[in-house]
Swiss-Prot record:
The active site is at 114 (proton acceptor). The gene is cobB. PANTHER family: NAD-DEPENDENT PROTEIN DEACYLASE (PTHR11085:SF4), NAD-DEPENDENT PROTEIN DEACYLASE SIRTUIN-5, MITOCHONDRIAL-RELATED (PTHR11085). It is found in: Cytoplasm. This is NAD-dependent protein deacetylase. It comes from the Bacteria. NAD-dependent protein deacetylase which modulates the activities of several enzymes which are inactive in their acetylated form. GO terms for cellular component: cytoplasm. Its EC number is 2.3.1.286. It comes from Listeria monocytogenes serotype 4b (strain F2365). Disulfide bonds: none annotated. It catalyses: N(6)-acetyl-L-lysyl-[protein] + NAD(+) + H2O = 2''-O-acetyl-ADP-D-ribose + nicotinamide + L-lysyl-[protein]. Belongs to the sirtuin family. Class U subfamily. NAD(+) binds at residues 20, 32, 96, 98-99, 114, 181-182, 205, 223.
Length: 229
């Protein structure tokens, strides 16, 4: 049994911090790797910015619907194992991903730190709109307003509710497991600064990450690691 298995068995309050590397095995590209979403694109950050949404809503809509949605993607071993652990323990998943795969796998306590593509709303009347409706048109059939996905765009702040839920879970956790992220994007990478100092931290990632305090690094394929838990 590896150290992570042992720690998961002993822990009572677990937080998983997940990034793009968790969803890549499900066929969803990450952003910045050589085969990622941004590869070969001239201004992807602008296309996913608040400015683009306001100034060029048609261009924003085309980019998002053509590049961001993978409705046929299925959870992989990482998602399903985390959901299984949640059935037995107090587990909170705080994810940078916006693809809804943790929920699709059955996880209930998920903080979508950057929002979710599968929650959309009309900017004019505030009504919730299904992703299916948004994928057909970004104009709300009810009031004619422009629909947007409830995700955090460049130039936008993380919702306070997501930060509050994340900090509450982090402070209570006796085990924190960072999975599939380089853990360099702020404020997500600052969450562990608010941990209970007795909490153990593990990181499972294909590349080494760095933290300013002790943690256990598993430089490995997260799918293999979670398939063996």
């Amino acid at each position: 049994m590896n150290k992570l298995n042992e720690a998961l068995k002993k822990a009572e309050h677990i937080v998983f911090l997940t990034g793009a590397g968790v969803s890549v095995p499900s066929g969803i590209p990450d952003y910045r790797s050589k085969n990622g979403l941004y590869a070969g694109m001239s201004s992807p950050e602008y296309m996913l910015s608040h400015t683009c949404l306001v100034r060029e809503p048609e261009k924003f809509y085309q980019f998002v619907t053509e590049n961001m949605y993978y409705p046929d993607a299925e959870p992989n071993a990482i998602h399903t194992k985390m959901a299984e652990i949640e059935a037995e323990k107090d587990v909170t998943i705080i994810t940078q991903n916006i693809d809804g795969l943790h929920e699709k796998a059955g996880s209930k306590k998920v903080v979508n730190f950057h929002g979710s593509l599968y929650h959309c709303y009309c900017q004019k009347c505030g009504m919730s709109v299904t992703a299916e409706e948004y994928l057909k048109s970004d104009i709300h059939s009810g009031c004619g307003g422009v629909i947007r996905p409830d995700v955090v765009l460049y130039e936008e702040a993380i919702p306070e509710s997501a930060i509050d839920q994340s900090l509450a879970a982090i402070r209570q956790a006796d085990l924190i497991v960072i999975v599939g992220t380089s853990f360099r994007v702020s404020p997500f990478c600052n969450l562990t600064d608010y941990r209970n100092k007795k909490a153990r931290i593990f990181a499972v990632n294909k590349e080494q990450i760095s933290l300013p305090y002790p943690f256990e690094m598993m430089e490995s394929d997260a799918v293999k690691v979670f398939a063996e838990i």
